Amino acid sequence: MIPYSRQQITEEDIKVVADALRDDILTGGEKVSKFEEELAKYVGVKHVIAMNSATSALHVAYLSLGVKDGDEVITTPITFAATANAALMAGAQVKFCDVKANGNIDEEKIPALITPKTKVITAVDYGGNPVELDKIINLAKKHGIKVIDDASHALGSVQNGVKVGVKADISIFSFHPVKPITTLEGGAFATNDDELARLARLYRSHGIAKTKLWDSDMSLLGYNYRITDVACALGLSQLKRLDGFIAKRNEIAKFYDEKFSGCEYFKTIKIPANTTSSRHLYPVLLDEEFWDKKEQIFEALLQKGVGVQVHYKPTYKFSFYKALLGEISLPNAEKFYSAELSIPCHHGMSVDDAKFVASTLFDVLSNV
């Protein structure tokens, strides 16, 4: 089975993790701060605060921006549920904005959703393809709204020569095993704002900061969102290979792009010339004639050894959100969900693997 994505763990990764386990300090130590420092340097941002998950980092992002009961957050439904869930955890109401054909939030549809209660717009760089963040930031500034870039898919992505993670008030990265690098589980909060970074560090660790010697002060109600030194040792080792990971993913994606050009069964998402995507996902968008056969296609591919996935069921279609918000239908999000199928594209693959995936996909679609 070729999975749609997976981690790549080397002997060096295992060694640094084993070495970290032998250290006296297993959490809150130098490896955490070193990982934060190296990640900030890589992205080109002033502060990185590492946490135990991207969900934790999202929750802290909303809290640090002052999101509270009665505030509204605008975000995309084509994302993992945590993007919206974390806003609810902070007390906000969520308003979902429709997407474009590439799965990213449609910035042209955001203005109609803005009210005096809107506190934050949260964009998601779907599959590693950056959103039109400059347009979103310019819109937000006109209304006094803050912007979060949920870049969980996009560590290492570049747009107009600038790495993702620099422009928004806060950017979020994920280190889940299928993401560009892994710390087993983990996430990060990135910002150029000193005060937001100070608040994030407090929220990460119970709202407590040391004052002198043994003494400390709890100045706000925080959480235990700390990440371990063992996890960060793995993160440091993986970060050294990130550019190579992305290059390999792009090699596989380039093969697909060429192989699927003019395909009669589906379309692919074109990455703009000014962009280097992390290629966290390689989505194919099935033609409408296949939508009602998608489960059959999915099962057939799995049986033939091609691991596929769907990214994503619109968040508002979950029963929890239906009970909370009632029935919602955003036409482009619905179409995207009906069409989307993520095929294997990761740095553990060879071009021969990609050839097998492509030929198997064609075989299944021609016989369904």
Predicted regions and their residues:
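Conserved PLP-anchoring active-site segment centered on the Schiff-base-forming lysine
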Residues: 59-114, 120
